[in-house]
Amino acid sequence: MALTYRSPVEEVLTLFEPTAQSLIASAAVSAFQRHEKDNFEWFRYSVPAFAKEHLSKAGIYLSPYAGFPHSHPVCKTLENYILYVVVPSIVNSTFFFVGIKDFKINFLKSRFDKLNMISALNRYVSSADKIRYGNDFVIRAGVEHRALKRHRGLVDSPTLKALMPNVKSGSKLFLHDELHYWSKEELIGFLEICEPEVLLGTVIYPPELLIGSDCSLNPWCYEYEVKKKKLLFYPDGVRSEGYEQPLSGGYLLQTSRIKLPNAGIYCVDLLCSRFAHHLFSITRGDLITPDNRSFGPFEAVHSGALAGISRGKPNFYPVSQHTILRVYRYLRSLKKPDKQSAMAKFSQIVHEPCGRAVKFMEEFSDLIINTGTLRTVINPEQVKLFFGNLGRCMPPCFASKLKGTRTVCLDEFISMLRPLSVDVTLETISMHSMTMVVTTWSQEAEEGVDLPKIFEEKWEGKQSLDRTEAPYLGLAPFVDYKIQWRLQFNIPKFLNQLAELFVNSCSVNGGVRSMSIPAYLRRLATCRSCVGRAMLCCLTEVDIASLRVVVRNRYPYTEDFYRCRRRWFLRIGAQRRPSFYIEDAKHLERLGQFEEEQFQRPMSRRSLYTLASVSMNGTDDPFCSDCFYDPVPVARAKIVPTPTVIVERALEPLAIDTGTTSDAPCDAPGATCLRGAQAVVCACGLSMAVSAVPYAELKMDFYPDALKGRDAAWYSKEDREYKYNGGSHLCRGWPKWLQLWMQANGVDETYDCMLAQRYGAQGKIGFHADNEEIFMRGAPVHTVSMDGNADFGTECAAGRQYTTLRGNVQFTMPSGFQETHKHAVRNTTAGRVSYTFRRLAKKDESRVIEEVVEVETKDMGFSSSLFGVQIIVDEPCDGVEETFNVQCVPGDGNCFWHSLGSFTGLTVECMKAGIKNFACGPEGAEKLSRQLEPNVWAEDEALCAACAHLGVDLVIFDEDQGFKMLYRYPGNKREALLRLKGSHFEPLEPKEMCVVKAIAQAVKRSPMDVLRVALKKMGEDFKEQICRGKGVMLDVFMVLAKIFDVSACVLQGTEQIMINPKGRIKGLFRMTTDHLSYDGVPDKVKHSEVNVYKHDVALQIEDLIELRELSSLVEYTPSFSRAKLLADCLHDGSTGVMCSELYNDKGHLCPEGRETTRVTIGVLLGTFGCGKSRLFKEILFKLCGKSVCYISPRKALCDSFDDEIRKARGNMGERGIKHYKSLTFEKAILQASKLHKGSLVIIDEIQLYPPGYLDLLLLLAGPTMKYFALGDPCQSDYDSEKDRTILGSVRSDVFELLDGIEYKFNILSRRFQSSLFRGRLPCLMYEEDLEAGAPLRLIDGLESIDTSAAYSRCCLVSSFEEKKIVNAYFGERTKCLTFGESTGMTFDVGCVLITSISAHTSEQRWITALSRFRKDIVFVNAASVAWDTLQSVYANRWLGRFLNRSARQEDLRRMLPGTPLFVEGFQKNLLGADEGKRECKLEGDPWLKTMVDLLQVEDMEDIEIAKEVLQDEWCKTHLPQCELESVRARWVHKILAKEFREKRMGCLVSEQFTDQHSKQMGKHLTNSAERFETIYPRHRAADTVTFIMAVRKRLSFSCPIKESAKLNQALPYGPFLLKEFLKRVPLKPMHDRKMMEQAKFDFEEKKTSKSAATIENHSNRSCRDWLIDVGLVFSKSQLCTKFDNRFRDAKRAQTIVCFQHAVLCRFAPYMRYIEKKLNEVLPSKYYIHSGKGLEELNRWVIEGRFEGVCTESDYEAFDASQDHYIVAFEICLMRYLGLPNDLIEDYKFIKTHLGSKLGNFAIMRFSGEASTFLFNTMANMLFTFLQYDLKGNERICFAGDDMCANGRLHVSSKHKNFMSKLKLKAKVSNTMNPTFCGWNLSSDGIFKKPQLVLERLCIAKETNNLANCIDNYAIEVSFAYLMGERAKQRMDEEEVEAFYNCVRIIVKSKHLLKSDVATIYQTARVD
């Protein structure tokens, strides 16, 4: 597949010869030349790349050499396109051009012959025209007028004034950029008067204005602003070039015809439209015209469905379609999408987005990430679609909160996504048609508008307000007007405002109108405002009818239905409009002025109005002018608020007395005058007068005591403390302000205590009496209510009655009232304050009692009866939700019956039908009957009837009143618990009822039935336990089990408890810390015969795929003899402790007659700490609900598994882990036949079981189980003193299982965290986890132990007897285990005790002990011998290897059974191994993530190729005895002093040589001034002098213009250079798709191979803010260890240039493709050392026979010498290989334009380029091919600037002249000892100079870095080491000595080697 599409013609052309192609191309060249010549003058302006793309897509030609600057090049190009391309094809010489400069006319005449007769009609319209046109035309002073009288205003307009006299009728005109200034009337008048035949005109108008856009949607082309009715247009966004035009000037965009007043018709056609530039044709005559018109494209999309969840419902979003789709696809393709990646992708696509686009993309990406997908086409998700669309009916602010709606909107938006287009329906315009209205989103304030002034000039306040006019300056005190005209006169809006005015003026508190609409309008018409009367007079009957509709639909009658409930429907009688309060004198004055204007009723400043009641009798005009307003002088008004009375005994409200208010003084500020009932009336007729509180505001708001729902303060004259059940009050004294307050408000001064309370909203107090002992009995109580409203209730034998208290009022409950009545408060408003004044009892007679005060008294012990049901008010109820679970029931009016049904099991209809027959007295029959109707609330009658009829006592927790109500009927045996809150009943269930539920599940009954029986059988004590919500004890469960005859098997951890074993009902229960659950029938069957297969718990093969891949599958047939031997030992008690016949009454376990069946066992083996158990636990918890049995030989391991199960309960639930078991090995044998068939059986630590255990288990459990064995055969095995004589000689199960079997063994341990363990144990360690640790500690003698040290907390010993020693010396706190006991355990630090007995311990136990510790291990020598002796005793044992660091992995093979295959980690077949890998790596660099493919790589099977293995020739190598110091003595005198070697620049000095020892705690091999590191210069990035030296030598600077010119001059040489190269290397030009894909993959794989942290640290290079043509220059930090750099002075550094990642990602894949194409055809005689190993180089060198004189070449400043000739060769090479032309152009741009902070570079090569090594190598090859006379038999190797040939090369003079042009100059060397890339070449192979390796090894020692680099140095030495004796022939004496020291250092440090190179040195011995 080609990189770019080519048409068939293009494909054929590529097959022609170049000469034929040139012939065909000549025609195209001529055409291009002609076209460029004709159009260059018009399209020569330099435009941005983005604009160039859009203009080209719009069909506008742009010169390829457009370099002329212009202030607004894009709009100028568009103007030229229309004027010089479009218009000339339409017009002819008969046209007159209007409003155009002469040079443009002359240009058209000269260019187009048919326009040589055109002429211009210019005139002065604006002041700028005098400059634009000059004085070269004549204006007529006077002409004959063709206009009629009605045209007088038009002909005098500036636009037409000078034009019309010069235009003849029937002429043809072209108006240049002028029509958008003409108004519609001017255009119609001009067409009517002048009657032109054709009128062409250009219009500049952004079409997006037609859809309300307030900003440009093509900002690259133009920008604009809308200010009032003006459009400010800025071409190319340049404000200095902007101009102003009418906002309505775009009416032609929506016009198809123009109808003239004289009935003439003109047709309007849009001939050309490019963005904001349009060409219109207006032709005379009535012909067919289009009906619709569309404009585009725009950088925007239609908002579509997203408008429904967006603020303001926008029409579009300013982002292009392809951008949105690319970002959407990109985020949907990521496994872990994030907003950073989305913004990076957006920045990659759009280089300079606007702020709105950035904001949209940020929020749009967040929507994509947090919103899932929805299927709407195939298998649609109809339910989600339905509910999602349902939410779209809501406002956007609510719809956006619904997840389903967001999903539907996003899905529809993407599905229907389309670019924004402005579609308009064309209209016919006339002189009187409505002008186009352009609405934008602009919300700017109008200039010159004083809003306060306009408010004042409305109907209210203008004539009466006395204030200085001032502009609006911020938040000023506003006045709330009920009536004001806010809009200009517009009938529809006027009617809406009139409706609101009518409702506000004429509605009372029930929504009832106090007058009809006609009557209101008649009254309104009497106002003095002329404007108002004029507006009202305009209303017709139709308008009044419309007003009625508006009022009826928008303002329906409303009332507080929730408060009145059913009484709302019965509400009759007087309705009263609420009073409203006069705030201040100014308000009063303004209201008076309004009253006078509206109703011609004067009102004085001291008058107060209140509305009289008006009865609604159904008439249409209930208005009465005499009683509508009733003025009452303020000075004579008595201030009495109006209470509303509600009697609960009757459903209807009491009639309210509306008598006339008596006159009384009313001087208090804020006082209120209300009309109506003036007393708190009790049901018995008692009346308590209510009076106002004139000075309520003088109170002190201080409430320090917090109560439930209110705050309080207690005041007393006698300083008494007030205590009660809910708390207590400290006395606040009797302050002065309180005394004055009582005097001012007329409160009797005999009261000596007061409780002040401030309520919250909906506060309440139950019925109570103020008769506490602290107060005087029979004394009156005075109550004050302020700052809010409340319902005050009274209760006596006659019933209950409530009175609503509003405002600041007070009254007194008379003497004796507390003994005969009770009172209550409810429905308090927030902030309502009550003062309760009382009299204290005498001090000697009173006592402090724990009584509830007014706010807390709940009428304790109150009792009544109804229908024989006793109603008891019990103790207060608090914390209902803490002790009970609340069950939800519907709130449809039947909530009580729904709740009761939860206990009775009956439906609502059934219960109501039964109760209808309930016999009750005549008093309650009517009420009960009404309450049994559908959806009617239940009251006391229904509750008592249900209690008596259904036999259920009711316990109701009334949270609103705060107490518990009991409804009891004699003989009832059941009880229902209900909660009443907010007038809603809900059933309650005790929270901790797990015991009851578990019993209920076992007996198959409802929990309520069980609870009822339990309450009956167990009494009140059980009821109290249940209701406390704390659960019950186990002994209670035992009693319940007996009551219900349940045989309960209770699982508590690993133990089983049998309760009531003789019970009839069997049940399995599981008990945890605080919970009991029913698990069904017992999990284990009683007999194996009934153990049937259960599919839901059995595991299938597919459930175990992961386990089977990780393990080795072994076929095994259990041995009956081995099983019987172990069964015998278990039976006689010699093995185990649970299976003995003598001690445990167990029978013989060996099954008789059981057939032995072959079983597949998964074996998962690995070394210590490899993660066997952890891996299994991770996999097991994926087997939710399956049956798993974990078997362990150690109880501690079982406990650990149980802990993991408990942790998993939170995620998997109780059912998920129900069938998980952990058993010790004996319990597993006993229960094997009862396990579920198909269970997963895990045998952990397989090496620790007694021999024959596996056989016995397989025989007992059967072959249906899935078996997996874990363990490590190298660790502790089974050993028991009791059965050692019987089983000691029997081979263990793991050896029997794996005998002769090949299996995987994991040798990678992740346990160890200290480098102390490196090389001491036979395993691989995870190097990243190893931290530097202290050296190994060896303690001599038990007396040297530090018992306070960390290692003393754990000690391992070899026998049980040695535990006594540990206890004696370490103490009791030390955890002491034997080696065997520690199997499977891990500790951080600890010690190992070595005694004389330890030598008899097996190796398996020793390796177990040595591998138990993660961080540190300490050895304590208690063997009474020296460490040297111990080391010799244990020399060939694990302890000796540990001490000597000589442990090897191969030592494990001798201890393992079968044929182990060592693997590193648990490996499985990886399918899609790299899925998501790159995405995770690139999380820290979201920009780079957008540049690489994140796709999963296709899995390919590796083909194993058979390789021939030859035995290497080996001969003895003599290594002379030579010390390091003697080698150093040969050259130490060459090290000069530091001051002589460094370079100076002014006061700066380089820092390349050290004279101090390393700070890395390395070895001191020499004195600090002669360190090995001082041999070589070291470059550091912070060394300024070294960097400047590098810049001066290695970088060349120039400017892009010069470099581009030089490259253009060199390009003709490119084909010549390519031809010479192809002679030697015949590249294939055909494109190879697979090779290109592989090249791209290789680059991306290399780029993402770094760690995620490294990628994130370099993420700034991926950001678009880093310009692509700017590089970052820095010097490479390195130690220059080339042989030529030994003992030299300071040298210049190597410079590196960092490029933007976009540049690398652009070129790197193609450079790798070129490299693959090169290697594809590279002859074998040429070698390129790239991507190859040293072994391959070694083989090629041996084949090349590098003997005798060879040729080497080196270059001076190789990178800087890669000049324009080399780039010309590279460009021709890329074209030859068919690389895209745009890539080649990008490459040329980078090479010529690259710069940095230092300046612009010349054409050269940079280290850091994507193509550095490849093109360096190819330039080296090209230079070699041109410089030398090659015969064809030479073997030459290349690598960058290195070249070496196996013979003497002779210089050729053939290309001498051309070679002199190149900056590239070679330094040729003919030598007998050739080198290449630092390697010596010979016919025996390659080897490194020993001096270099030795000095590097010593430097590594000095810097403590040997462990990290010894592998590399060992590989370099190995080539000479493997040459054997032949290496000596290639070295001199100094080299041989250095080589010996290299080998010696490597062998002595062999334990540090981590690679396979260590095997080469295994036979080495150091004497």
Swiss-Prot record:
Q: Which GO terms describe its biological process?
A: DNA-templated transcription; mRNA modification; proteolysis; RNA processing; viral RNA genome replication
Which terms in the Gene Ontology molecular function aspect does this entry carry?
ATP binding; ATP hydrolysis activity; cysteine-type peptidase activity; dioxygenase activity; metal ion binding; mRNA methyltransferase activity; RNA binding; RNA helicase activity
Q: Where is the Fe2OG dioxygenase domain?
A: 750-841
Family named by the database record: Belongs to the potexviruses/carlaviruses RNA replication protein family.
**UniProt cofactor(s):** Fe(2+)
* Active-site positions on this chain: C994, H1075
> Which residues of the sequence carry a binding annotation for 2-oxoglutarate?
R832
Describe the PTM. Specific enzymatic cleavages by the viral protease yield mature proteins.
The chain positions of domain RdRp catalytic read: 1748-1855
Q: What is this protein called?
A: RNA replication polyprotein
PROSITE patterns the UniProt entry points to: ALPHAVIRUS_MT, OTU, PEPTIDASE_C23, PSRV_HELICASE, RDRP_SSRNA_POS
Q: Binding of ATP: at which residues?
A: G1166, T1167, F1168, G1169, C1170, G1171, K1172, S1173
Question: Which residues does the UniProt record annotate as the domain Alphavirus-like MT?
Answer: 63-252
Q: Where is the (+)RNA virus helicase ATP-binding domain?
A: 1133-1308
Q: Which InterPro entries match?
A: (+)RNA_virus_helicase_core_dom (IPR027351), AlkB-like_sf (IPR037151), Alphavirus-like_MT_dom (IPR002588), DNA/RNA_pol_sf (IPR043502), IPNS-like_FE2OG_OXY (IPR044861), OTU_dom (IPR003323), P-loop_NTPase (IPR027417), Peptidase_C23 (IPR008041)
| Claim: ATP-binding is one of the keywords in the record | yes
The OTU domain, residue ranges:
884-991
Tell me what organism the protein belongs to: Blueberry scorch virus
Peptidase C23 domain location, by residue?
990-1080
Sorted alphabetically, which keywords does the UniProt record give? Answer: ATP-binding, Dioxygenase, Helicase, Hydrolase, Iron, Metal-binding, Multifunctional enzyme, Nucleotide-binding, Nucleotidyltransferase, Oxidoreductase, Protease, RNA-directed RNA polymerase, Thiol protease, Transferase, Viral RNA replication
